Each structure stands twice: as structure tokens, then as C-alpha cells.
From Swiss-Prot:
Database matches in PROSITE patterns: GLUTAREDOXIN_1 (PS00195), GLUTAREDOXIN_2 (PS51354)
Location(s), subcellular: Plastid, Chloroplast
Protein name: Glutaredoxin-C4, chloroplastic
Gene: GRXC4
Tree of life domain: Eukaryota
């Protein structure tokens, strides 16, 4: 019986270690979700990424307001990118959100625009001002 107690007590420290381990990813996920909730349009991006530049250029051409989070500049950018991958299943940038909903990357955003669905979604999100009549 003494052995059973020692084996169960030895498993406890590993349990507590496992509980402490995910704190950084959980914090990054919470931060990513806060960022997404803070703005109608959020683009997780990298400053040197041509696909990110293309999406940001499109949003600028559409006069859409958006928040860009440059993961290569953020001190916790790599943790944020991992958290986004866990959350959305998308590891690459740009990672676009509109009204809190994951839209996808560059190809997804461009396809949505080409299909005529992006502007209405941006307008509904309040990112594009509707002209007064």
C-alpha cells in the first residue's frame, strides 16, 4: 500500500506541472480573442508578407477601417500565431476576421471580394461608412 501512495503522490506534481504549462498559450489565445473583439475588422499580418500587403491594400482601396496586428513586430507574435492556428486551424498570415468571424487568408478574402460578398460584410460590420443619401 505504501507504494500505491507514493505512486499517486508522484503523479500529483506532474498534474500541477501540466496545469501550469498551458498558461502562455492560453494567455495568447485570450489576447487574440480580445484583439478580434476590439475591432470590426482585424488582420493578423507580418510586415514582410506580400499576401498580407495585398489584403491590407484591398481594405485600404475599399476605404475600410481595420486593425492590423503585425506578428513579426509584436513581442508575443509567435505565441499569438500559434494560438490563432489552434483557434482557427489556419497557421498562415494574413489571418482575417470580420465582426469576430474568421474569414481566412488572402485567397479567401480575395475570393469573397470577387464574389461580391466582402463589401456588404465590411459595411455590415461598420468598417465601411455608408454614404448618406
Amino acid at each position: 500500500m505504501g507504494m500505491a501512495q507514493s505512486s499517486s503522490s508522484s503523479s500529483r506534481p506532474s498534474d500541477s506541472e501540466q496545469l501550469e504549462e498551458p498558461s502562455k498559450p492560453v494567455m495568447a489565445l485570450d489576447k487574440a480573442k480580445e484583439i478580434v473583439a476590439s475591432s470590426p475588422v482585424v488582420v493578423f499580418s507580418k510586415t514582410y508578407c506580400p499576401f498580407c500587403a495585398r489584403v491590407k491594400r484591398l481594405l485600404a482601396e475599399l476605404a475600410a477601417s481595420y486593425k492590423a496586428v503585425e506578428l513579426d513586430v509584436e513581442s508575443d507574435g509567435s505565441e499569438l500565431q500559434s494560438a490563432l492556428a489552434d483557434w482557427t486551424g489556419q497557421r498562415t498570415v494574413p489571418c482575417v476576421f470580420i465582426k469576430g468571424k474568421h474569414i481566412g487568408g488572402c485567397d479567401d478574402t480575395m475570393a469573397m471580394h470577387k464574389g461580391g460578398n466582402l463589401v456588404p460584410l465590411l459595411t455590415e460590420a461598420g468598417a465601411i461608412a455608408t454614404p448618406s443619401l
